[in-house]
Swiss-Prot record:
Quaternary context: Component of the BAT3 complex.
Compartments where located: Cytoplasm, Cytosol
Its biological purpose: Component of the BAT3 complex, a multiprotein complex involved in the post-translational delivery of tail-anchored (TA) membrane proteins to the endoplasmic reticulum membrane. TA membrane proteins, also named type II transmembrane proteins, contain a single C-terminal transmembrane region.
Example of a GO MF term: protein-folding chaperone binding
GO cellular component labels: BAT3 complex; cytosol
Alphabetic keyword roster: Cytoplasm, Transport
Ubiquitin-like domain boundaries: 1-76
Name the record gives this protein: Ubiquitin-like protein 4A-A
Length: 154
């Protein structure tokens, strides 16, 4: 199938791929055509950022689809360093959850329940669109703004 990749500024290109290709492969093809290093690319489909390790079929990307390309500046990190502190907070949540589950389930059942919760959590995060993330960030950064429903955060 042929995908069209359109940078926010610049000329678009077409790439020939299969639906089983990984996003990282698409980035390599785009890198060859547009001279943009793969590590500086962020591909979006219908407002959702695509993860390198996932396949196009994971996002239901079909023939004639159009992907948007955001180019990161050369010196900018991919966000891994900035996520380290939030990552430790998340691991703290999973550790606390593990402790709570251990009080109510056998060790094997607690591990299964936690594994399923982690999978559900990660799936939910992958399904967030950029609009969803923007709304959530706005609500968290400006909780006192009028007209915003923040009751779900209680």
């Amino acid at each position: 199938m042929i995908l069209t990749v359109k940078p926010l500024q610049g000329k678009e290109c077409n790439v020939q791929v299969t639906e089983d290709e990984k996003v990282s492969t698409v980035k390599e093809l785009v890198s060859e055509r547009l001279n943009i290093p793969a590590n500086q690319q962020r591909l979006l489909y219908k407002g959702k950022a695509l993860a390198d390790e996932h396949r196009l079929s994971d996002y239901s990307i079909g023939p004639e689809a159009k992907l948007n390309l955001v180019v990161r500046p050369a010196g900018e990190r991919s966000g891994v360093a900035g996520m380290a502190s939030s990552s430790s907070a998340v691991s703290g949540v999973w550790q606390t959850l593990s402790t709570v589950l251990a009080k109510h389930f056998s060790p094997a059942d607690a591990a299964k329940v936690q594994e399923q919760l982690v999978k559900d959590y990660e799936r939910s995060l992958r399904q967030l669109s950029l609009d969803d993330i923007e709304r959530l960030a706005g609500r968290l950064l400006h909780p006192d703004s009028e007209g915003m429903d923040t009751s779900y955060m209680d």
